[in-house]
Amino acid sequence: MDFLHKATLLEQTLNMEIGEQVKKLATYTFSNFIRCPEVQQAIASGEIRNDMPHLRFVYIFYLFKKIQDFIGDTEVFGIYEKVMGVERANSAKLVDVVQACTEMRPHIQAQICEHIERLTRGQGENVLWEVLRDGVISSSKLLKFVKQQTPDSKIFNPIPIQKNHYVASPVAFGVRNETVVKKLISELVVEEGIGCVTEFGFMLSPNDGIFGVSLDMCTNASMSDHNTVEFTSTTTIYEIKCRYKYLFSKCDYDPIYQAYQKLYNSPGRQELIDFIQSIQKPTVEYVSRGRLPTQNDYLLSFDRSWDFGPPKRKRKLTSGHKITEQCMKYNCYTESKVIILTDPALTSGKIEVKGSFFVDIYINPRHAYYHQCMLQYKIVTNYVQLTKGDSCKHTHPGVFLVSAFFRKRNSADFPKTYIKTERSFVDASVEIPVLLIITPVFVPHGPLVDTLEQAIKFWQVAVKEEFNHWPWAPTSLSAVGDVTP
């Protein structure tokens, strides 16, 4: 790789077609930077420090020095120029860059990460988003890495995310309906006047350079004059799930629709239980106190009313389940809010709240969704604390998991469907939302640090398998930054 060569990406690709230029950009990954002969030799000889997160910021220095003219944005490299001085930054040798990144203050690292988020919006459609996620443990795969189940989830040189999904596939369903749920939250759930941010790029963890997330939506957040996200002490994260298996048809032979009609006409707890039970694989699992939940369903309840399947003996919680037990204690006394939406076929196309109530279901800390929320909580906490100064040193974001249920459109639906007012139309290509279950998520400090420590250990194993000479990630990185509730 030519990371350390003077020629920029723009200079190298002037005579290439745009597709070839993008392919070239896609090769500038963290893995390929570490493989550079100059970097391998410097690590092997001890000429440079190889610890994280500093080596990640060395990579970012060379990446943006190489591509800034090509992407037409100089903000990231400009931060390095302010830290190092313009002349030194543009003529620095590898050892000088490593020294500068080692001495870099955490709030400067956070500024760099803020601009990376800005430049990677569009997520899977943005090649830079793919490039910067190399060598990173993402929130959606955190549980797999903790369990060391990674045949399809490589940390380094991961398989590119498939973007051309078949329109009827579960993935395509979730992607196209996520926008609708964001509108529902901003129009019907959040108080009027509260700022919402609904598009995020890749958020690298500035404290370790190992973890990263891409959020769905935040409230009590806004855009700065530089178009970076400004989180606050009251920021709330919403992780959205639109699961294909919940989709049903508006017809009498669909058993889910039959149960939904009863719920719609008489919104209440028992009607919701009957509705959830009508789904082939219900999303709520009954678990008695002191017992270990499975990892099958992402919502739990202590109430036997939610016990849908044949009787099963569950294992007792033991000392080996300390993390699960602590997380259950933090979450089991919460309730989820259920919002029943009006049927737009009956309201001239208008979708609003028909009714709402609370139910005794909470998030399953053994499920991947909990780990996803856990890492989002950790990284947003660090962004707030590093960018807002002492006033937000001990603040923490709220986190909610939103389960959205949809039905298929039919001939009775109006051509134009909208949420609350005619300013917020729902695209005719998406399904009709029928209800939301909004579940609060709480993350205790001890289990968070322990989980991150396990993931860092696995990252270190993976990096040793990948390179002859590798970066070093101390497990103490799991506790960097104040994330104590």
From Swiss-Prot:
Main location: host cell
SUPFAM superfamilies cross-referenced by the UniProt entry: Restriction endonuclease-like
Keywords for the protein's UniProt record, in alphabetical order: Decay of host mRNAs by virus, Early protein, Endonuclease, Eukaryotic host gene expression shutoff by virus, Exonuclease, Host cytoplasm, Host gene expression shutoff by virus, Host mRNA suppression by virus, Host nucleus, Host-virus interaction, Hydrolase, Nuclease, RNA-binding
GO terms, molecular function: DNA binding; endonuclease activity; exonuclease activity; RNA binding
InterPro entries, A to Z: Herpes_alk_exo, Restrct_endonuc-II-like, Viral_alk_exo
Pfam families xrefs: Viral_alk_exo
Claim: RNA-binding is one of the keywords in the record: yes
Xref: Gene3D superfamilies: Herpesvirus alkaline exonuclease, N-terminal domain (1.20.120.860)
EC number: 3.1.-.-
Compartmental location: Host nucleus; Host cytoplasm
Binding partners and assembly: Forms a complex with the DNA polymerase, the DNA polymerase processivity factor, and the major DNA binding protein.
Job of this protein: Plays a role in processing non linear or branched viral DNA intermediates in order to promote the production of mature packaged unit-length linear progeny viral DNA molecules. Exhibits endonuclease and exonuclease activities and accepts both double-stranded and single-stranded DNA as substrate. Exonuclease digestion of DNA is in the 5'-> 3' direction and the products are 5'-monophosphate nucleosides. Additionally, forms a recombinase with the major DNA-binding protein, which displays strand exchange activity.
The protein, known as: Shutoff alkaline exonuclease
Organism expressing this protein natively: Alcelaphine herpesvirus 1 (strain C500) (AlHV-1)
Originating gene: 37
